[in-house]
Amino acid sequence: MVSAGNHAIVALGWTTSEDGTLTRPLDLVENWLLARIQRANTPPGREAEGLTYKLKLRLPQDIDDPIPYLRRAWLVFRYVQPLIGAIYPPYSERDETGRYLVTVPPMDPEEWLRLSFHVNQGSQAVFRDVDDAGMIFRPRPTAMAYWFPPSSTLVIRSTHLRFDAVGLYKATNTFMLGLESVFRLGLDANLDCYTTDVKQPSLPPGIDYILGFPPQETPVSHRVGCAVDELMRHWHHGLYSLSLPVREGSEDAAPANTQHMVTLFDEPTLEAIVAGCKELGVSVSAAVHASIVRVWASFPQQQHTGARNMLIPLVANLRPLLDPKWVVPDYALSLCIFVVPFCLTGGFEDLTQRLGAVYSRDLSALPSDSAGDPVSFLELLPLYDSQEAAFLGSLPVAGCPPFRVPNLSSLGVLERYLARAYGQKGAQAPVCEIEDVALVNATTDPTIEFQLFTFRGTMRLYLYYNDAYYTEDFLASVMEMVRESLLQELGLDGSESSEGLDPKEA
């Protein structure tokens, strides 16, 4: 077996046992997400906040059987990114003080591949097809890889505790570089001979250590307290938030399967959208988010009598706050996001402009003190985390409508994080390519999640939902309304919109 500590740089905060197992307590952001998972209404055998990631690959035609190469690349990935094999709660233990731990066992190559890499075909098939892989997320101790030969698709499944979306795409680049290297060097090279973008495998510290959070008992300054109070006011004002009607009789139903649909914007349409947004002085993300809000507000007969506001959960990327030495591929497999609440009040006129103003701000400095000066997340996260957890744990509040506002995660152009092709030299054909990507978030409540990104010149807007609460037909019409709202508000012809919606596309 290969201990992570034998070949990787191990940061402060990790403890090594006699057999080479490494552990550290969950950091503040991991504990924040774990609390959200534990609050979820999840049936036994399923997990909230699970990620199912689909990579449709084009591999060398002269390789008759790509499976050994994919297995080897998955092993290389584990070697250079030890955290892909990390064990998180509920499978990891607690320390003597009761804190949850992240555990990285020594790497046994054969055991790692036996447990975590599966070929989905014949009697060994776990899923019916690629679409089926995203419907039910059953928890596993480590990340899992499933190869679907008919569609040449690699499906990676993991708890969200292991990485966020940006980290996942960064990690994809590492995996693809390793795969190209395996095709180039063959199956028998030593693990440290294969090349990726990871210069030295490492186990980075928890984000608490990097950001220098003070001990829990440290007194909180008045300016930090005011900034946290401002964020919490957004949560409280957003209690009376707009929502979509769920299917009749499903208010108290247990969650069922995660489903998804996607609407595509081809390159000419995307160029027109970008031009329209530039003319308005807003980002594409703000325009899409405004369209979602408009559609939600178009169901007035379904709203609670007090629902006048719209709570917008914004995803803040903490990576810009990290020391530059940690903003590297080695830190891809880490949770570096935080949800910031922003409540839209006072009606929906000039919605795009107001949302655009929020999106144009640095979300890491969105909260402000009593003088209006921004307060960094570095200062307020510890206090805000505890207050947000207490608030969300108090829901539902009597007399308030159900709390199920839509989330939008906007990832921009994925080519910032990964390439379309790998191993291409000059006019030669690339060794391997990513033809398409898709990411499905497991949903276990009536909250609808959107994800927006562009890859290979096509913008995709995904919608994820749990089919215990909504029908496909209803949400297909909602997605069409969002699309039409976006195009019409930007002065674009929406006549082709129905062709862009594909509920079944992976």
Curated annotation (Swiss-Prot):
Signal peptide: none annotated. One of its GO terms (cellular component) is nucleus. Induction: Expression is induced in loline alkaloid-producing cultures as well as in planta. This is Loline biosynthesis cluster 2 transcription factor lolU2. The keyword Nucleus applies. It is found in: Nucleus. Keywords: Alkaloid metabolism, Nucleus, Transcription, Transcription regulation. It comes from the Eukaryota. Transcriptional regulator that may regulate the expression of the loline biosynthesis cluster 1, one of the 2 clusters involved in the biosynthesis of loline alkaloids, potent insecticidal agents composed of a pyrrolizidine ring system and an uncommon ether bridge linking carbons 2 and 7. The keyword Secreted does not apply. One of its GO terms (biological process) is alkaloid metabolic process.
